[in-house]
Structure formats: C-alpha cells, structure tokens
Amino acid sequence: MMAPSIDTMAEELDTSITESTMALSVYLLATAFGPLIIGPVSEIYGRKSIFHITNIWFLVWNLVCGFAHSKGLLMAARLLAGFGASAVYSLGYGVLGDVWSAEQRGRSLSLYLLIPLTGSAVGPIVSGFIVKYSTWRWMFWSTAILQLTLDLSSLLFHESYAPLLLRRRAEELRSNTGGSRYHAAIEMREAGLSPPRKLSRSLSRPLRLLAFHPIIQMQAILEGIDYGLLYFALSSFSALHVAAYGESVEISGLHYIVICIGTVSGSQLCGPLMDYAYQRLSSNTGETQVPELRIPLLLPGALITPIGFLLYGWAAQYHLIWVVVDVGAALLSLGMQIFDTTLHAYVMDSYPEHVSSASAATQVLRSLLAFAFPLFSNSLYDSLGYGLGNSLLAFLSIGIALPATGILWRWGATLRGRQQSSY
C-alpha cells in the first residue's frame, strides 16, 4: 500500500528514496521473524488467543505509523506493525490445515487467498488517491479503522487446533469422572517435559525444520526467490508509469489492478485444478495422502513466470503501449501465484500437525529476500534497463524453478522419509 506514496513520504520526512523504500521493506523484515514465534506458540496455546493478541498489536503500531514525524519512528513502527501482521503467514495456513482435508486443500487455499491477494493489489490503488487528495498518513489510519472492524468480528472465531482441543477434552473428562485414564496424544508425547522445556522445544521447531528438513529448505529457497523477484520487479511498477508514461501518482496506482488480476486468477485457477489433479493422480496410482501428487502443478507456474518477466521488461524498455507492460505484469503474478500456492499445499500435506511451524520456517527466507531485493531494483534497472534487467530475473526464475520441480517429483518422498521428526 505504501508504494505509490514513497516519493511523497521521502519529501515530507526528508529522507532519500532508498530510506523510504526501507520503510516499505522493513515491514517484510518483521514478517520473516514474527512467524518464528507466533507459529509455534499457537501450537501450545491455540490459534484463537494468539490471533487476538497479534491483531491488537498490529492495530496499535499501524496507528503509530500514521502519527510518525521522523523516519526513525516510521521505520520502527512499521517493523513492529509487521510483527503483528505476520501472524497471517503462520496462523492462516495453520487454520486451513486444521479444518480442511487434503482432498479440499486447493479449494480452501483459493478461498483463503482471495481477499489478501485482492487487498495487496487494491491497496496501492487506494493509497494513490489518498496521497493525491489527502495525506499519506491516512493510508495507515484508514487501515487501522478496517483492522478494528476485523478485530471485532474475530471475536466470533473458535479454536481449531485439534491437539489442543483434544487436550482440553481429556482434561475435562478427567475432571468430570475423577479417572486418570483419559489422555490426549499430545499429553503422552510431552509427558515428563516441564513447561519451559515444552515452550523452548516449540519455539525451536521452525528453525529445526529449516535446518534439518530438506523439503522445508527447498520451499524456503523457492518461495524466497519467487517472492523477492516479484517485489523486485513491482517495487518500481508505479514509478515506471509515472516516469515513462507521464501518469500522475494516483493513476499510476491503478495499474496494480493487473497484479490483482494475475494473483487472484492464479489462486482461483490453481485451487480447483489442484484438487482435480490430486484426486485424479490418487485414483490412477492407487495412493492417497502423498504430497508429491501436488508437484505437477508447479510446472505451469514455473513456465508462465519468466514469460511475464520478459514481456513486462522489454515492453517497458521500448516504451510500448502500457497495456503490454500490464499484461506482462499480470502473467508474472499469475505464474508466481500458481507456483507458490502449489508449494504451500505440498508443505501442508507434508507437516499436517505442524503446519504453522512449517509455514513459519519457509516464511523466513521469503520475507528476507522480499525485504532485500527491492533495495537494489533501482540500481539494476538504472544499469541494465528494464529489458535486460527483467531478462536476468526471468532466467534466474526458470533456472531455479524447473530443476526444483524435477527434484521434488523424483526424490521428494525419499527426502521426506529421511527427515527427522518435526516434534
């Protein structure tokens, strides 16, 4: 949402463009480390309570952003707001894994992703008009008003984490019957562990997954590069239309509609196709609950993404009509969304009891690269231009995605079989 207002904020707060871009990117830095705490803690205390706490945290610091009168306070508040918002990266996928079966994974992901993906594209459009007719501070205040509404509606949510619900049920049965024979599986597994030991073991889980589980390592690298490249290309998307096509800030923000079209189309196409392909492959092979049956859908995403990069880059390089640039950006976001949605489903299938921790582990590299890549986008495009610059990104994307798809399809089950327990 901040992208169209970077120049305005830089002027008012007396910062450089790089420093203003840092205020945009530091939010992503928080989303790298927030899930490392939020995800595993939700597997101890439940999704519901952690969800309420992080919602309030985000609301408070988002308001502070709107009142910031120095670049230091703005960056600090953005960092802390990002920590609260990062809950969605672990709790969201955790709830999906709690509620929907593997056969419904695609449908649940497509429904879940619809609103955040739409919001990520509509946000810059709205902020462009806010900057034009009001002040950039209302970007944060209006978001806080919406967040307050969502916080109130979230009071209707129920706990969904099965191990915690079973623990509570076992405790209730022991209390009501006076017997000690009722125990949940998680209680048996954690027998003899002190509360600090349980907490430390849970908090270390995402890092243990990232350090010792090849599946998590591969997804972290793939999603990190994908997400970083997307932010790299799109961090200058609005500025391109202002500089090359002479558009105003608020009109340039309208071009983010094509990003919305690409990402939403990717998620909504991928969901039903994923469920259909999974059920068809399960029927043909006679195997069920095999995460590798998700892998074939990575291929179209891996191929569409570089096409989008090339079209976007060379159309911008030769100042072709803006429609061509936008089609390239739409294809780029479409391919990446198909690829990332499929990867998420694969990891959710691989770690059904620790979806939040697994999502947190993969989120680290994803957010770090999304934080770092935009800092160098202006330098790359100034040196190589949009054509060669995006060609480099296209070859990097396909050069990593295609081999990784083959490795997961051929050796994914073997890698999963050799990994340590996620407990």
From Swiss-Prot:
This is Probable efflux pump mfs2. Gene3D superfamilies: MFS general substrate transporter like domains. The keyword Secreted does not apply. It is found in: Membrane. GO terms for biological process: export across plasma membrane; xenobiotic transport. Belongs to the major facilitator superfamily. Its main location: membrane. The keyword Nuclease does not apply. It comes from the Eukaryota. The chain crosses the membrane at residues 21-41, 49-69, 79-99, 111-131, 138-158, 220-240, 256-278, 295-315, 319-339, 360-380, 392-411. Probable efflux pump; part of the gene cluster 27 that mediates the biosynthesis of asparasone A, a sclerotium-specific anthraquinone pigment important for sclerotial survival. It comes from Aspergillus flavus (strain ATCC 200026 / FGSC A1120 / IAM 13836 / NRRL 3357 / JCM 12722 / SRRC 167). It is a multi-pass membrane protein.
